[in-house]
Amino acid sequence: NEYLAIRDAKQMGPVFHYLGMTVGIGVSENPAKKLKVAQKQRIYQSDIVYTTHSALGFDYLEENLATSKSKKFLPKFYFCLVDEVDAALLDSAQMPLIISGSPRVQSNLFVTCDEFVKTLKEGEDFNLDSTRTSVWLTRKGVKEAEIYFRVQNVYDPNNHQLIRQINLALRANHLFEKDRKYTVENGEVKLMDEATGRLLEGNKLQSGLHQALEARERVKISLETRSMASITYQNLFKMFPKLAGMTGTGRVCKDEFREVYGLGVVVVPTRKPNQRIDYPDEIYLTIPQKLYASLEYIKALHSKGQPVLIATGSVGMSEIYSMLLLREGIAHNVLNAHNAAKEAEMIAQAGRRCAVTVATSMAGRGTDIILEKGVAELGGLAVVGTERMASERVDLQLRGRAGRQGAPGLSKFFVSLEDDLITKSGSKWINDYYQREIAKPEEKQKTRLTSFRIKYEVEEAQKNSDNSGAASRRSTEQYDESIRIQRQIIYSKRNKIIAHPDFTLDYFLSVLSDAMDDYTKKNPFKEQADLYRFVLDNISYYCEDIPASLDVTDLQQVKKFLSSLIITEYQKKKDRIQDPEMFDQFQRIVVLRAVDDCWVEQVDYLQQFQSLVISQGYAQKNPVFEFHKEAFESYK
């Protein structure tokens, strides 16, 4: 984050200055003020630049919207060193950085489709896949939609917008869990980082999904914007010939680092022996049983003065634990997405005697909890996990809050078969076992589950979840490959236009000839009104009447007429501007704007198409192949 980039640059800057190197800070020290181009040019000329992954990504996108050399500031990428590298390269890998442009025409179907989707029943009208990452209408659901919206065929091309909105409403209602994937603050839907529980300020879901979530929550629906430029963190960091990083949890994902980024993982031994005790999980049948057992354990630790960090998987669960602790009269702090501003202050107090801190997994990374004098003798910090997280790395980060720098500490996780991890990623066996047990009278139910098979199934559920996350990241990489190649070509062409503008009248006439050939293949002129419309849209708003003798079906005649029109308009502009240097600049900006407009259309179309084509996997088609095929055709 910005705070750490600024802190580290100021701490290490004097060392690098002493060694004869310059240091720049790529983020603004005043959040209210954005860095200007001149400032960025000075910063990026430094030998070493401290910045954040989002600041670097947006700088890259902004530079590639520049219209002159004077507005460019980035050097050629060479070496990048990433702190908390698994968070940046894996957890954030699928998150696209997007510069939004003008809003698209807003659909009035968001609320209507949300109301329709809320009437549907799972298993009858729609189905979810086993990992609850895809949702689709059944035949009965399709029939319900046709009755509800009074259409004969919901998949008719004329109903494209309707089926798109229904699919968005399905995803918003059934794939996005409130207080885990997003939350509502001050009448706004705000996204959350599932791995850390932190709010992703300024981030929005694309392709209408954010507006569908707003419709679900009945808050004001924001404008759906078009993407002017976008890039994923995966592709941003892959542009560096040399890439490295550090993290406390790299070993468990070493295979993915090698497959995706070609990076090996080296384990560095700890400076001091690890004294933390990691106790086995306690597994229970239901969430209430788990809550009671974990609360008793926390009370026992608190009674002897040992500081406790309670790690929850969602904002909702952190608030439940807070309520239970209040009922027991235990003073505590709550750290979640709703009060992240107080994070540093709360973490600073978490190592004090008798301190109890309830936190989402946001407390698991980049925060040192300093033990108060005398706390080490009590056993150090105790980390109590209230569920196994979706990734083993998050569990390890949470355990790692205790036992820092050779200090004592302990960690223990409490799990139930009703936890999200088990219900979404657990095997059929463990879910069947739960159904059998829960069907028994309460007095005959097993409460604490100690069998080796149950423990094994919990571990397997987490492995399944990790594998699902890795597969999802690989899928994102596959889809993004076409956009990556096209982006490189477009940005390379832009740079050539900026560096060597060499435009002549002949160049524009050749562009016209190619454009005419492409246009008339799809939209042959049938009458003079068609040609007149083409002129108004593409050449000039000031067009005299088209000669009555002109045969608009004869392409050569039309080209001759339009060429003369372009020569006239070109000369008018040249006479008006007069200064040759200014005229060159005018031509460059015209061409860049034309390239940018086409690229915006392409990026926006591919994002819309990607969300649509994924559903073709259920139509016996390979969605990735279909996407690449269409991406190539639309680019041509």
Model-derived regions: residue spans:
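Conserved P-loop NTPase motor core
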Residues: 2-442, 491-492, 509
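Extended, charged helical/alpha-beta scaffold domains that provide interaction surfaces
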Residues: 183, 187-190, 198-203, 405-406, ...
